[in-house]
Design a protein with these regions (language model features):
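Active-site acidic-Proline motif in GNAT/NAT acetyltransferases
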Residues: 87-89, 93, 121
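Residues forming the Rossmann-fold NAD(P)(H) cofactor-binding site
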Residues: 93, 97, 101
Length: 183
């Protein structure tokens, strides 16, 4: 397995985005209506990653885009996770956790202070991933901030257990490995 940085408009990114949107339709009755501009994922203000198997098949994706304070509830220094997705055939192998760790590392290196994401109650596996990775609930933000089924989480990227926006803070596991399946 290897992780590759690609543009959000890359053909593999587009194909994976179609798959995640189809899954949103299955779970919620519609796709994600959050406005997304491909340029938001261009370094150093964002990144988009794809995990490939040894044969070059795309298995998982995720990106972050820099967000700062404004009317939608963001804070200065936020990195918002978008389009985290693992194809069904590759689920349960730690790929989402691998992508999330790589996104955190990239956002930290870009000077972002907090990683945030929004998910919904119909994605309990996503909520489980984020909470088991040290994310805690934060005030709602973004397009779905008024949706009752929306859940927002955050994690400080400073490495010092700093504030995630809810006053509780979070620590990052410094021993996290980048190899899939490693202990």
């Amino acid at each position: 397995m290897h992780i590759r940085t690609v543009g959000y408009g890359h053909p593999d990114a587009v194909a994976l985005d179609r798959e995640v949107q189809a899954e949103y339709v299955e779970r919620y009755g519609e796709g994600d209506t959050t406005p997304v501009d491909a340029a938001q994922f261009d370094p150093p203000h964002g990144i988009y990653l794809i995990v490939y198997d040894p044969d070059g098949t795309p298995l998982a994706s995720g990106g972050w885009r820099g967000r700062d304070s404004g009317e939608e509830g963001y804070a200065d220094g936020d990195a918002e996770v978008k389009r985290m997705f693992v194809v069904r055939a590759a689920r349960g192998r730690g790929l989402a956790r691998l992508v999330l760790a790589a996104l955190e590392d990239s956002a930290r290196a870009a000077g972002r202070r907090r990683m945030i994401m929004e998910t919904g109650t119909r994605q309990p596996e996503a909520i489980g991933l984020y909470t088991s990775s040290g994310y805690t609930p934060v005030p709602k933000f973004g397009v779905y901030r008024f949706d009752e089924g929306s859940r927002c989480f955050g994690k400080a990227l400073s490495g010092d257990g700093g504030d995630t926006g809810d006053g509780r803070g979070a620590d990052r596991d410094p021993g996290r490995t980048r190899a899939v399946g490693a202990p």
